[in-house]
A protein has these predicted regions:
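Positively charged n-region of N-terminal signal peptides that target proteins for export
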Residues: 1-4
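OB-fold and OB-like single-stranded nucleic-acid-recognition modules
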Residues: 18-142
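Short hydrophobic transmembrane-like helices used for membrane targeting/insertion
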Residues: 6-7, 17
Length: 142
């Protein structure tokens, strides 16, 4: 009985460490190419994902801390930024590697520049209609 309890506790001690912590500095490895997008009639920066980055990040559960950016408060659409809104990608002060889309499991209420930690699955994107990285199934870490 005691052995079974020890094995069970040992197993559950690993359940909370499945995700890796992702740093904003690691995202600086991403190279971008500027291409003209006919759909938006504008120049956009498209990420060039190396096989190594895809293997290490795509589809992996990650945890990251940053500043919430409210894109649409009614539809609960948010981004996460390495920097506060006044100096983030949307204001032209930072690169596209410093921001990611958040797709929450459930609607959440956030305010711009609220510092949050989120956990979710990384989706590496090349579509000019989305940010380079989306955190899918995101949950707020308490």
């Amino acid at each position: 009985m005691r052995t079974g309890l020890i094995i069970t506790l040992f197993f559950f001690s690993f359940c909370g460490v499945a995700q890796e912590r992702l740093s904003w500095s690691a995202l600086e490895q991403i190279d971008f190419t500027e291409v003209y997008d006919e759909g938006t009639a504008s120049w956009v920066q498209v990420p060039q994902w190396t096989p190594e980055l895809r293997e290490n990040w795509d589809g992996k559960e990650m945890k990251i801390t940053g500043y919430a950016i409210v894109l649409d408060p009614v539809d609960h659409i948010y981004a996460l930024s390495a920097f506060p809104f006044s100096s983030c990608f949307f204001c032209g002060a930072a690169g596209p590697e410093s921001v990611m889309e958040l797709e929450f499991e459930r609607p959440v209420e956030l305010i711009t520049d609220q510092v949050i930690t989120v956990i979710g699955t990384l989706d590496l994107n090349t579509s000019p209609e989305h940010l380079p990285i989306t955190l899918v199934g995101a949950k707020l870490k308490e």
